[in-house]
Amino acid sequence: MKLHELKPAPGSRRPKTRVGRGIAAGKGKTAGRGTKGQKARSKVRPGFEGGQNPLYLRLGRMRGFKNPFKIVYEVVNVGRLNELPYEGVITPDVLRSFRLVRENGAPVKILGDGDVTRPLHVQAHAFSESARQKILAAGGTVEVIS
């Protein structure tokens, strides 16, 4: 036996039924669609839900786009920094070790909610203006790192 002599087993392959090819063919006249009605005539259009308000109308239009270059910061408020039991320079690695930011390597931004009662020496990727003012007013230092 050679490769070109291979054939499927007898009875394992049936020819496709050709509908609408005369009454004698067994699937003539209505071609298995029954009589009358929307589904007997043509196709129901894509997205049609039987008269119910379809999903694409219920959701409304989505506008705009997602900026693939958007920088998403891990944020920490100065009030949390003030509570840290740490005296050295506060860096993103220090914040990760205290579990104030996640371990995902995202840049860290310091925001200005809370009070600063002691001089803080902070290094971060970004600062809000209110956070910068509060840290400097308490005698601390602010350094933007890249």
Swiss-Prot record:
GO molecular function: rRNA binding; structural constituent of ribosome
Quaternary assembly: Part of the 50S ribosomal subunit.
A Pfam family assignment: Ribosomal_L27A
Annotated stretches, region: Disordered: 1-51
GO BP: translation
HAMAP family listed in its UniProt record: Ribosomal_uL15
Gly residues: bias regions: 23-35
Keywords on record: Ribonucleoprotein, Ribosomal protein, RNA-binding, rRNA-binding
Similarity comment: Belongs to the universal ribosomal protein uL15 family.
Any one GO CC term of the record: cytosolic large ribosomal subunit
The protein's name: Large ribosomal subunit protein uL15
